[in-house]
Amino acid sequence: MSADGRSGRLRFTKMHGAGNDFVVLDLRDGTPPPDAALAAQLADRHFGIGCDQILTIEAPRSEGAAAAYGIWNSDGSAARQCGNGARCVAAWLVRDGTAQGERFIIDSPATAHAVERLDGDRYAVAMGVPQFEPTQIPLAGFAHARDEYALPVHGETVRFGAVSMGNPHAVVEVGRVDAAPVERVGALLQQNAAFPDSVNVGFAQVVDPVHVRLRVFERGVGETLACGSGACAAAAVLMQRGRVERDVQVSLPGGELRIRWPGDQEQVVMSGPAVFVFDGEWNR
């Protein structure tokens, strides 16, 4: 069980994927999902457990899936997609015994994901087919998909690619990711009316045709050490432009991910680590 209603104790597992860290809760015993206030409290690094996102293990929603999971950002808002979280949920289900075999399916709020166990603590997750049409992102004010968009933001023009990986992403290509204005430009794009659902903003540096460096300013969280869907989005935008090959290493501040996109109508596959940190109880 995840929670003990009489004592108010909440059992959890702390995990991370390339430094993107999570509190994992098993809600399959009927424990209700956290509301926004509780999610923010759990995620608080000073007064709670501390994490980028809360992941809730739930009953499967699609036929043949091992389980489903919910996603809550550190500000308490709900999310629809989290690539690093998908790998951690997969590893949690394997340790729990729920997921059997080398391949299985898990349901995110956005879609069903095929998962494959790799060597050690690594998992591969099929993240879906990138969607570039503005209505699917959503991106307002543009009728058709483009390789690059431009928006006036506080007296400057920001150029970016845009894609949905089940959640909205803007990708800004930069010469040096270490010097990128991640927080300033990330926050400005998130607040721009062109993104009615806000947006995750990635800053990508092409090192060579098979290597990208990336930092991501996530909606509802801020900059994180890694963002799996952001790595997929950056790779897809750069691949579509012909800037990189269809199989790349993406280096984030917290670690390395491998992103493969075999063809335009095929799913992006993300590979990377899923690490257990500790199990605990939170007294609420």
Curated annotation (Swiss-Prot):
Site residues, Could be important to modulate the pK values of the two catalytic cysteine residues = H169, E218
Q: What is this protein called in UniProt? A: Diaminopimelate epimerase
Supply the alphabetized keyword list.
Answer: Amino-acid biosynthesis, Cytoplasm, Isomerase, Lysine biosynthesis
Recorded hits in Pfam families, A to Z, give: DAP_epimerase
Top enzyme class: isomerase
Residues annotated as catalytic: C82, C227
What does the similarity note say?
Belongs to the diaminopimelate epimerase family.
GO terms (molecular function) for this protein are: diaminopimelate epimerase activity
Tell me the organism: Xanthomonas axonopodis pv. citri (strain 306)
